[in-house]
Amino acid sequence: MKTITKILSISIVMLLFASCGSSPSLQKYYIDNQDDDNFRSLDLPASLVSLKDDASAEAQSTLASIKKLNVLAFVKNEANEAQYALEKAKVKAIIKDKKYVELIRFKDKGRDVVVKYEGSEEDNSIDELVVYGNDKSQGFALVRVLGDKMEPGKILKMMNEIGDIDGDGFKGLKDLAKNMK
């Protein structure tokens, strides 16, 4: 009887330890899906983001706090609609985690966008900004902005100063994404 109790106790402890680190994370989600044919992934240095010529010193220092961007996009088509729904649900579950604080949410022309961050409340700085955008006809994109002591308010101000954000401004990036894999 003591042997069974010991085995059961050890099994429970091992199960508890195994489950502690098993919660899904964005990093793990990226790694698990970057080679899937339905996804496109990019790792971009912050140097690819440009500010307007008359950008403020504050916007320039905010951009300097950003190190890189990880982009993972699910490209939806008729053949993968079921997987699209499944993957969208997975991403939403991950970013619902309490460690992510919502910064802004908006809907426009059938697109949903959520911006969240993870960081320190003590000094109002963040180390990861997450942008999730969904378009029911095209798929979704997940962007992780990684940096050191980024400030959410300053990032929002800087976004207003980012140069040419029209269709032509992203044409090169769109062409690159089409040819990836």
What are these regions (language model features)?
Residues K149-K181:
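C-terminal partner/receptor-binding element of secreted or periplasmic proteins
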Residues E78-E81, L86-D112, A177-M180:
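Function-determining sites in protein domains
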Residues G21-P24:
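Bacterial signal peptide processing site
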Residues L16-S19:
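C-terminal motif of bacterial Sec signal peptides marking the signal peptidase cleavage site
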Residues M1-L8:
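Bacterial N-terminal signal peptides that target proteins for export
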Residues Q27-A93:
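Early exported N-terminus immediately downstream of N-terminal targeting peptides
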Residues I94-D148:
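Surface-exposed, polar helix/loop patches in the mature regions of secreted/periplasmic/lumenal proteins
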